[in-house]
Amino acid sequence: MCDLVAYNVKDYGYAEYAENIEVSNGEFRRTRSLIPFNYLDASMQAFRWDLYGENVEVQRSIAESFIKRFCEYQKAGKGLYIYSRTKGSGKTLLACSLANGVMEYLDICVKFVSVPELLEMTKKSYKDFMEKEDLEKIRTAELLILDDIGAETKKEWIDTELFRLVDYRYSNKRVTIFTSNISMNALKLNERIVDRIFSMCIKLDLPEKSIRTIQAHDENMEFLKGVIK
């Protein structure tokens, strides 16, 4: 809800009208979650399951249960592993839609980070205390989206850092949503990491279809309708 308000500024008079925007708790939590701007308004209500052109009732049921029964997922320490080989198949969009849905009714700390970004933050944290603090918030978040796991280069220090993160979350039953172009069985990570991911996640395989391409086309056509007179 937005109301118009005017402010009387000393030695100036009344300023122009501005919108007094009431920010909901859910909106506030989203802005602090590090979810990319393009996905801040993503929701399950707007997620286009129909674009896949095939039966996705199982995937849809799992996704809906994650929001509706999140407390049970949390108690069991279970997250999701959202997988599809196809780029643009909606993995990140679905993960953010789920997180936004949970934040609408639960006061929990949610964080989003891609694995490449996480590794870059880790390197900087050796010299930067602020980066170290941010990493700790990511590590301990009640719900973490770890985007694009499996895309990282195979190096010992990377395995070490990922194990520390995954092991902490596994041991403390912190809910994690992983997204990946690589199936769990094919992850080229330390076996201890993969074992923990298997234990802490429900598999949610999306169809091999780029819905991003379809949505981009629809958005472009809608935009052109408004600018071509």
Question: What are the functions of these language-model segments?
Answer:
Residues 1-58, 65, 204, 208-229:
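A short, basic N-terminal segment
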Residues 55-78:
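A short, well-structured juxtamembrane/interface segment
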Residues 147:
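PRPP/pyrophosphate-binding module of the type I phosphoribosyltransferase fold
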Residues 54-61, 85-89, 99-140:
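Short glycine-rich substrate-engagement loop in P-loop NTPases that contacts/grips substrate
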Residues 108-109, 140-143, 172-178:
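Loop/turn-to-beta-strand initiation segments
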Residues 65-71, 121-144, 160-168:
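Conserved alpha-helical scaffold flanking the Walker A/P-loop in AAA+ ATPase domains
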Residues 72-95:
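Walker A/P-loop nucleotide-binding motif
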